Amino acid sequence: MTKNVLMLHGLAQSGDYFASKTKGFRAEMEKLGYKLYYPTAPNEFPPADVPDFLGEVIADAPGDGENTGVLAWLENDPSTGGYFIPQTTIDYLHNYVLENGPFAGIVGFSQGAGVAGYLATDFNGLLGLTTEEQPPLEFFMAVSGFRFQPQQYQEQYDLHPISVPSLHVQGELDTITEPAKVQGLYNSCTEDSRTLLMHSGGHFVPNSRGFVRKVAQWLQQLT
């Protein structure tokens, strides 16, 4: 029986773009009986509103060709200089799960991994889903992921440690999501459920045969 996986792209990407950048990963997942779904973030804001340190990501990750703004799961909060997850993202993912799920796992890259990690603290509760609509997740994978930093989210992580089996992928040359940020999300998971996997590259989802084989081995250990 095919199992569905929810794939959350990074800042300024789209579902189609993320799919094109994860062909090798997707091929290996399909061999294991998984079907990958790539939604596109519902929020769009002007490139000028994006922090300077994310410029490299935007330049290397164009949208779907129809959007002139930057697609994102999160929105900037000008009053604090931080960010927040808007209700539009929650509502969109709620409906997406109902229409395309249920999902066995969730995989995120960069901002998508941050969102996936936050949702993994209480996937059904945060998205307003019953266990009939969405059974408990079987796994969670974060590539260049991070724990939300704004203060209003800390209680959620502290009261609901991520207990879903999780794989945290960190690039040794990643200058966008620093090791400390990856470690922050990793430390938000229970000790017996988390695994850290390094790769020699930067800020991207590796597609090499060696990497996807390690992911496959991790998934097979869960069954």
UniProtKB/Swiss-Prot annotation:
UniProt xrefs under InterPro entries: AB_hydrolase_fold (IPR029058), FSH-like_dom (IPR005645), LovG (IPR050593)
- Underlying gene: FSH2
Q: What else is known?
A: Present with 1070 molecules/cell in log phase SD medium.
State the species of origin: Saccharomyces cerevisiae (strain ATCC 204508 / S288c) (Baker's yeast)
Which PANTHER family does this entry report, sorted A to Z? ESTERASE OVCA2
Function description: Serine hydrolase of unknown specificity.
Keywords, ordered alphabetically = Cytoplasm, Hydrolase, Serine esterase
Its organism's taxonomic lineage begins at: Eukaryota, Fungi, Dikarya, Ascomycota, Saccharomycotina
* UniProt record similarity statement: Belongs to the AB hydrolase 3 family.
User: What GO cellular component entries does it have?
Assistant: cytoplasm; nucleus
Write the protein's name: Family of serine hydrolases 2
